[in-house]
Structures are given as C-alpha cells and as structure tokens.
Swiss-Prot record:
Record keywords: Cobalamin biosynthesis, Glutamine amidotransferase
NCBIfam families xrefs: cobQ (TIGR00313), PRK00784.1 (NF001989)
A Pfam family annotated for this UniProt entry: CbiA
Metal-binding as UniProt keyword: no
PROSITE patterns: GATASE_COBBQ (PS51274)
Its job: Catalyzes amidations at positions B, D, E, and G on adenosylcobyrinic A,C-diamide. NH(2) groups are provided by glutamine, and one molecule of ATP is hydrogenolyzed for each amidation.
Signal sequence extent: none
Protein name as catalogued: Cobyric acid synthase
Gene expressing this chain: cobQ
Organism encoding this protein: Vibrio cholerae serotype O1 (strain ATCC 39541 / Classical Ogawa 395 / O395)
GO MF annotation list: ABC-type vitamin B12 transporter activity; catalytic activity
Family per similarity comment: Belongs to the CobB/CobQ family. CobQ subfamily.
Length: 484
C-alpha cells in the first residue's frame, strides 16, 4: 500500500523538518522504500545532490534518514532570499532567475507544474513519501496560488497531519485556529494533530487533548516529549543554543551576516564539547576568540559592507595583529581577498567592493553558479588529511601562482589559500568540518593541539534515531497506516 503523508505546522519551527526525518527513519527501519519531499522551501542552507543540483539542506538530512542519496526532485522549488523582498528561484536544482515577491507570486502557477512533475516522479520510484509543508497553511495572504501547503495537498490528494510546538505556549489556540482557517475540503484532509516538545506530566495535558478532539473531531495522534540536548540541522534559523565554556580548548566566533548561508557548516564545531563556540550578532564583539570564521553569504558585497558597519573589520585586523587565526568559507573567503567585483549586478547594484586584504586575491561574480560535491586533501602546517565538501557559488577567484593553496581536489585542481603569515585560511568548500579528521586538523592549526576528533555524521545518525524512537513510542501510527 502506498503511503503519502504531508506534515504541516501551525508556525515556522514547529518541528516539521524533524518530524519528517523521524518518520522517514521509522519507515526505512521497516524496509519500506521511503523518500522525503518538500514542494517549496525558502532557505539559505542548501545542499548539492550527486547530479550537481541544489536543494534545501533539510531535505538532504531527511534523505539521510531514509538511507538514500538526495535528489533535486525532493525539493523542486528552492527560494534563496537575496534581499528583503526578493529571492533567487531554483527549480529542480537549477537557478532560474532572481524574482521580487510580487513576480514570484504570479509565477507560482507555473512552479506548481514543476512541483507536480517531481512528485509524480518520486511516486513512481518509492512506496512512501513523507512530505513537509512550509510555515503555516493558515497564512491568509499566501493562500492564493499556494504550492507549499494545502494548495499542494489538494492538487496531489495527500492526507495531512498538523504539528504544533507546545513549548512556545498557546498550542490549543494554534491547532484549533489553524484548522478553523482552512476550507472544508482542506479540513477533511487533516487526519490528526501532533503536539511537539512537551515537558512534564502528560496526565496534566489530557483534559486539553480531550477538548481538542471533541471540538475538532480530529484525533491527537500523539505527544512528542521535549528531547533535551537534541540537535539536528536547522532548516534556516540560526541555532539559539551556543556552546560556551571557559575551559574549552578552542574559542571560535562566527559573525552572523544579514544573508548568511549554509551556517550548518559550523554544526560540527558548535556541537563539539571541546570547543567554545558562539555566533556573534549585531552590536556584539568578536573579541576573545582564537579562531574567527567568516561564513558563506548570499550577498557577499552587501554583507561585506555590513561587516564594516559593525566594526568587525577592525576587530579582525586587531585579532591578526595579536596572533589570532582567521578563516573564510565561500563568501567569507571572497571577503578576505583584495576586491570583490560584480560587473553584471549579479547580487544587486553593479560595482566593486574592497575586501579585507588578507589574501592577494580578486573575485568576480558571474552568472554561472558552480554546484558540485568534491573530495581531496587538505594540508596545513605540513600535515595532510582527507577532505571533502561541496561548492555553491557564483564567484570566480584568481590569485598569483606563488600563493599557497592548501587543498588539492581529486581532479588535480586547487582550492583555497593560506596566508603567508599562516594566520589566514580560506576555502570554497562548504561542509569542510564534516569529516572528523579535517575538522581536527583545522582546529589544531588554529591552536588547539590537544583537541579530540568529533564525528558529526555519527552524531546526526544518533539524533535521527532518537527522534524515530520517540515517534515509535509516543505516536499512534496505526491511526495513519492501519497496515503498518
């Protein structure tokens, strides 16, 4: 029996991505061929598929939960915001164009065809598809031409469950109100509710559950407990949980740009118990770090200007004068060069921006985006380790032949630079910290000589298994699939 199920939420960050990942693992454990699907995702955290396409990072993690490789059809529409009112539109893994919100609203009728094409392809290949909605289905202003929530569910004729986060408060108002704002046909599609992140005695919640079921005629499929210490890659929001301790072996600071991208790069550092890790926000200081890492950016020149507006450029130069280490990834790497040129206006107004000058490097932004998974070797301080990652960038950087590139890729090409003073390191590789030995080598280069390796992939697997175990224990899945 085919199993299609869509998880929608009362709000953003209600737990949709994690619940879908857990359901994928539950079904995969039973030998069911399952895959994830998200019709439309708006996020700056993305992943590269084996065939060189770009999808939301959450769907790549959900594919991992299924034990399969990610595909562009698992997230056929990806929106990557590049301003407050516009985004780059990516269809089935390939960049289409930049669109303002009004233009994209009109385009959604066309985008729905792409969404349905991908979904139908997956239906032919898999026994089960766990579908993730976006935000809330009850956003009145977004319901016209909706392709992300009930608009898709109606078109594809799939059942829906609605999840809400009780830890935020107001869970019954969220669930009852969301259902009430749906049309009759949409309400009929809802098979039940899931309450997420509950702390305390479940008996004290029972009267509320009974009221909700009586008022809506829908069952509460289950109540998932608050999982202390749980961490799985965030879809887009910066993780609120920092890893602060005065006795850690390495202190890492990452400035949060206005268009920061792929901040999941830092999860292997943020979750490493040996590292004092912090994100540095507006009005905060970078001081006190051993290693400052400039992250990726969807708008490199704009974020370079933002960096200067915060005074972080002066703090970085002072950090270097005092012997500290600085690293840049992708857009952050470009910022560490001498100039970033945008003659075609790829990221906005055409022009050039002066970089921080740590590397004798020029970057020109181009219309062609490089999307690829890579492997190779990294050499720092004379020690070589295996390295891997993925590239997602529109810029091309050039530097003099006598500059030192620390990464040799499997095709013989070079990536990144190390400064002559050995205090700066830049690379285009997202995910460079995912391999334990690579992260360890970089941390040792930054001064943490006694630090231990941290296996982030293994930690991810434990997190996926943990949410799957909670689903098995606390959700009545036979309400969804009697034959399971």
């Amino acid at each position: 029996m085919k199993k299609w199920l869509m998880v929608q939420g009362t709000t953003s960050d209600a737990g949709k991505s994690v619940l879908v990942a857990g359901l994928c693992r539950v079904l995969a454990r039973r030998g069911i061929q399952v895959c994830p699907f998200k019709p439309q995702n708006m996020a700056l955290n993305s992943a590269v598929t084996p065939d060189g396409g770009e999808i939301g990072r959450a769907q790549a993690v959900q594919a991992q939960a299924c034990g399969i490789a990610p595909s562009v059809h698992m997230n056929p529409v990806l929106l990557k915001p590049n301003s407050d009112t516009g985004a780059q539109v990516i269809l089935q893994g390939r960049a289409l164009s930049n669109m303002e919100a009004n233009a994209y609203h009109d385009y959604k009728k066309v985008a729905m065809d792409t969404v349905m094409d991908s979904f139908q392809r997956l239906q032919q290949e898999y026994e089960a598809i766990m579908i993730e909605g976006a935000g809330s289905p009850a956003e009145i202003n977004l319901r016209e031409n909706d392709i992300a929530n009930m608009g898709f569910a109606e078109k594809a004729d799939v059942p829906v469950i609605i999840v809400a986060d009780i830890d935020r408060g107001g869970v019954f108002a969220h669930l009852y109100g969301t259902l009430a704002l749906l049309s009759e046909s949409e309400q009929a599609r809802v098979k039940g509710f899931v309450i997420n992140r509950f702390r305390g005695d479940i008996g004290l919640l029972q009267s509320g559950l009974d009221w909700l079921e009586q008022k809506t005629g829908k069952p509460v499929i289950g109540v998932l407990p608050y999982l202390h210490g749980f961490d799985l890659e965030a879809e887009d929001a910066i993780a609120a949980q920092q890893n602060l301790s005065a006795d850690r072996q390495l202190r890492v600071a990452v400035p949060v740009f206005t268009r920061i991208s792929n901040h999941t790069d830092f999860d292997p550092l943020r979750l490493n118990p040996n590292i004092d890790f912090r994100y540095v926000g507006q009005g905060e200081s970078l001081s006190g770090a051993d290693l400052i890492i400039l992250p990726g950016s969807k708008s490199t020149r704009a974020d370079l200007a933002y960096l200067r507006s915060q005074g972080w450029d002066k703090e970085i130069l002072r950090h270097l004068r005092l012997g500290g280490k600085v690293m840049g990834i992708c857009g952050g790497f470009q910022m560490l060069g001498e100039w970033v040129h945008d003659p075609l206006g790829i990221e906005g107004e055409a022009g050039s921006s002066e970089g921080l000058g740590l590397f004798a490097m020029q970057t020109e932004l181009t219309a062609e985006k490089r999307l690829t998974n890579v492997q190779g070797h990294l050499t720092l301080d004379g020690q070589t380790v295996a390295a891997q990652g993925y590239e997602i960038h529109a810029g091309r950087s050039s530097w003099a032949a006598d500059q030192k590139s620390p990464i040799i890729l499997s095709d013989g090409s070079l990536d990144g630079l190390v400064s002559d003073c050995n205090q700066g390191f830049g690379t285009y590789l997202h995910g460079i910290f995912d391999r334990p030995e690579t992260a360890l080598r970089i941390c040792q280069w930054a001064g943490a000589k006694e630090i231990e390796a941290y296996d982030h992939r293994a930690a991810q697997e434990r997190a996926i298994d943990r949410i799957a175990d909670a689903i098995e224990q606390h959700l009545n899945l036979t309400l969804l699939w009697p034959d399971l």
